[in-house]
Amino acid sequence: MNAITKSFTGRKRIRKSFGRIPEIAPMPNLIDVQRASYEAFLQMNVSPDSRQDAGLQEVFRSVFPINDFAGRGRLDFMSYEFEDPKYDVEECIQRGLTYAAPLKVILRLTTWDIDEDTGSRSIHDMKEQPVYMGDMPLMTDNGTFIINGTERVIVSQMHRSPGVFFDHDKGKTHSSGKYLFAARVIPYRGSWLDFEFDAKDLIYVRIDRKRKLPVTTLLYALEGANYLAQREQKIAEGGDVEGLDIRGMDQDEILSYFYEAVPFTRLGGEWARPFDPDAFRGLKLLSPLVDADTGEVVAEADAKLTARMVRKIAEKTRVVQVGRLDILGRFLAYDLVNENTGEIYGEAGEELTEDRLAALEEMGITELPLLSVDGSHGPWIRNTLAADKNSCRDEALIDIYRIMRPGEPPTKETAEAMFHGLFFDQGRYDLSAVGRVKMNMRLDVDAPDTLRVLRKEDILRTIKIMCELKDGRGQIDDIDNLGNRRVRSVGELMENQYRVGLLRMERAIRERMGSVDIDTVMPHDLINAKPAAAAVREFFGSSQLSQFMDQTNPLSEVTHKRRLSALGPGGLTRERAGFEVRDVHPTHYGRICPIETAGRPNIGLINSLSTYAKVNKYGFIETPYRLVEEGVLQDGWKYLSAMEEEKLVVAQADAKQDDQGRLTDELVSVRRSGDFRVVPPDQVTACDVSPKQLVSVAAALIPFLENDDANRALMGANMQRQAVPLVKADAPLVGTGMEAAVAHDSGATIVAKRRGVIDQIDGARIVVRATDEAGATQGVDIYRLRKYMRSNQSTCINQRPLVKVGDTVHAGDIIADGPSTELGELALGRNVLVAFMPWNGYNFEDSILISERIARDDVFTSIHIEEFEVMARDTKLGQEEITRDIPNVGEEALRNLDEAGIVYVGAEVNPGDILVGKVTPKGESPMTPEEKLLRAIFGEKASDVRDTSLKLPPGTTGTIVDVRVFSRRGVDKDERAMAIERAEIERLTKDRDDERGIQERSFYNRLRERLIGQTAGAGFKGIRSGTPITEEVLDEHHRATWASITVTSDEVMAELEKLRGEFKEATRRIDARFDSKVEKLQRGDELPPGVMKMVKVFVAVKRKLQPGDKMAGRHGNKGVVSRVVPVEDMPFLENGQAVDIVLNPLGVPSRMNIGQILETHLGWACANIGASIGDMVDEYQRTGERKQELLDRLHEVYGDVIFNEDVATLPNEQLIELANNLRKGLPIATPVFDGASIPDIEEMLEKAGVNKSGQSQLIDGRTGEPFERQTTVGYIYMLKLHHLVDDKIHARSIGPYSLVTQQPLGGKAQFGGQRFGEMEVWALEAYGAAYTLQEMLTVKSDDVSGRTKVYEAIVREQDDFEAGIPESFNVLIKELKSLGLNVELEQSGL
């Protein structure tokens, strides 16, 4: 039993773990996927000389240098650097800006003088200059981006890896059902190359999915061996290769690559051939097989040659006789030429018929080189050659050109250039390092991964492997294997996007170089960075993979950053994705979670990374394994991708082992090549590092996951992400040990950056004096706590300190809790007392019955913060104004507004209340004489403006928690804006003064330490030279003068000088930071065009749990609150404690999520143990007795290891704090697949002193009678989900109407009405309610004039009105008119 954590918070509440398997490998940081990828892209903290050729550096290197068309100028990329971002993260969120740093690129423009006679070039000038290339968004510490003030996440994309893939159509294409094999070469960017067999067994090629060509046309177009040999020779001789005429592959070369030549020899009137075991294996002989040398019969006619017989024959026989039938139908391997006359007897690939063979025999030919076409080598390439109309390179190139660019007249040069650009030009074709590595592995070739274009060998080898597949040798590829799918993380996605922007820019630069005087311009004159900046902006703003962060709670943030999507640009589409690509694959083990995936339409397309998974430099997902040698587990672990794992035999983490790590079972359950087997221990080559490496973070938070049905586990994992942060959070009593890791890595808590001592603390900040091991001050860290801030989902972000002044913290310790965290652990819900029983039908169909205590004590109360904003614009009629002076509004409505017309912080507001008063100038309307008179008398009147104030929308009631006022630069700030600015400057001043105070204290302490014991030097008034410096001497002088004291020791003087320099520099940095922040505050804000002032108001709404709210446990056990029952009516225990929640027991058996029952029992045991510890603590604090009893109780529940290491050594004060934290229940961890067993739960129930069955006798609160039988009662961790009835409930009397149909809009967001549809009309017809129906279809919907008449009638208190023609009828008539049918209502003849 091991404790999960021993951090600062871990010591305050120790979680007992039931895990038996030791955790060998540490879990990687949960959001490293994002951070590592973007850091590798920017290489921001790497010096320009040391940067790797990757990411941004690689993009610039690939696009530059840019040459002009005349060859006189060249623009080279030297390096890039980032300046400091203009605003920090918090300022960007407040002001609605993008958190980004300006990117400066140093470019060199070289110009040449060209000699017109000789054409030689000499350098004329070189100019280097940094050029601004737009702003590059930066990632926050939490792996997110701030774009226009909102936090966004770039989701990683899964796509098919570049490389070569072999597949077949599964027999679906052709009616005969035969497999048509295909191969596809996928580059990272560039043209796709597809090879395929057709129904006639000919091989075709497609380039970019265009019309197909015989594959031999492509082979003709490739450079021939003869040409390549000539080229090599020319280069070796130092000659020029430009003039060489390129010759392609010919028939001989093509055939000789794909087929061996078998020499058939004529011996004494009979033909003979070498005996090849492969060619004869499996054949049924039509005639006896005769040894050509001895004449001996080695196999009888009608015999079927088995592998054994063939081996036996091959031992003795070299050449065998063949009949004429064996030769007929075979093909010549190469041209048969009479060497004397040059006459061609037969061409390569020609088929031997009876006549042709007879003619050759007559000519006296005794040796025929024939292609090795037989049962194991098909004539596919030869047949394709015969069907191909082209016969040379030029014809082939023109054929390819016509298909790629139809309608353009081909020439030899253009066809040559186009073909070269398709696959052999680095600028247009890039396999990427991954593609090359994958291709090398699949084709069994060895090319360096820097070679990113195709080679002739790659194409030939691909075709050869496809032919082998057709011949029945080899395996096709599984495209759903994670060895063939890779992850594109944020850095790579950004790299591709930036490349697009730079390529757009490149064209503009080239044209500009041609249109200006190249000798006089500087690099920045040629650059317009807008295309690059626009590409970045477009990616972050509107890409499918750039998503508004799910910020409901810390878990949803972490999960969103670890998400893998198969959708998005260059990925799959929902409609096209089949079952296979969505399914769980054996290679997902430890890499992608088999449980957590998105809901219905996206199931299997949006996945989550497993807990231990990492993404390697090639983009493949890796998972760690412990290596095993000769049945012994080795120390350490190794991260392996799916390809590397293929060869391994992997045992599970729970395989039994002795103390030396030797596997002890006779047979071990393992995974090998995607199958489950049992093997002896000596065959095992690896072992899992942890049982939870299989699942994702959310699934690893579900205790007893192994006892839940997979569908319910999926719901449980997904619903935890929807849990709303509660006002009072509880960490789960029954956890899994993952809670602390999620809280730490999510960024919701505040984590100490370095070791230190808490110096000051209040509700909004923590000041830490950073120290080294010896206690010397290293600096000051000020941590600002986020107070009542709004998240993306309108939940409340609020942080609370966990430390007190004087506490020592270490780097990585959690010093403040955030939303949904408690004592440094994730706390999504509350532990509540639950009974499984029916109660008057109120828990029918998963309804949940709750006690009034839950609503009264704010057990499930959450705070939601709504943001409202209003802008004062400069309109054509004049400026809008934010003011308290609003026409026709009484003083009562203005009671919450200050003199500037903005609501006070702390005001309680209700629907319809004015938050910000605003007036807009009205258009000039013609005045009546009376108005003119009034205007002449009273001057300007308020009637010139109309009220456009920001009012609180219906359905919201709350408290104002924050107001922010933004004013345009140059516009005078109002009193409220000045007050906010003053408060902010005061806060910054306090930070500066505190930081300076700590630095000063530290400086003078260190100065004092160095001076005491030294001898004073000359030059300081008050201390005579040669006097020993003591504490008394120093105390006589003000400490500000100590820095001027000199000493006789040169060494100490140098140290003092260094100390002074460090102090001066630290103070300068603090002041510079303060000045910069104040300057930003006073500068005024960047607002959208035409906006003079903007006000944001934040309203906090407190939501109690009420009927209609959705709740859930962690096991997919969800339901809606049906009724709140008075505490006195709820069933209660024999000790008088009423249960909090009543759940329906029928929700368990059919759902098969038994985990909730086990959690209930274990929670019951934990709570009772906690209660007994609480009693002992109370007694001890009251009387000082029972301390030993308390220690014994802790020893009993925690076991020897934890007690001796962590509890027994605690000082008294910390022991009491620990015991008090256990009062609500002993927290335990039951890790997934390695948790508490049934005997463990029974043992815990026994220790708690309750019934081992986990059931208790309940008494009916209404009658006071005991229930007939005992009931399962215990503590379950319940969550309140983000589906709140207050957000869904909606009512409308009058609201907006659709412009065309004039019918009310639909939906809460549009403040719409209820649709009275076709079926509802039938219902009213059935009742014969004619008048009601008429109202529904006319005046209550789209009869415009009727609506007005009804209103007027009601105002006049009359009850008669007439319905007119619904507007939808007029729309129908207009529709008919558009078809040329004139429909008119003729009333004259009536």
Curated annotation (Swiss-Prot):
One of its GO terms (molecular function) is DNA binding. GO terms for cellular component: DNA-directed RNA polymerase complex. PROSITE patterns: RNA_POL_BETA. It catalyses: RNA(n) + a ribonucleoside 5'-triphosphate = RNA(n+1) + diphosphate. It holds the Pfam family RNA_pol_Rpb2_1. The keyword Transferase applies. Keywords: DNA-directed RNA polymerase, Nucleotidyltransferase, Transcription, Transferase. The RNAP catalytic core consists of 2 alpha, 1 beta, 1 beta' and 1 omega subunit. When a sigma factor is associated with the core the holoenzyme is formed, which can initiate transcription. DNA-dependent RNA polymerase catalyzes the transcription of DNA into RNA using the four ribonucleoside triphosphates as substrates. This is DNA-directed RNA polymerase subunit beta.
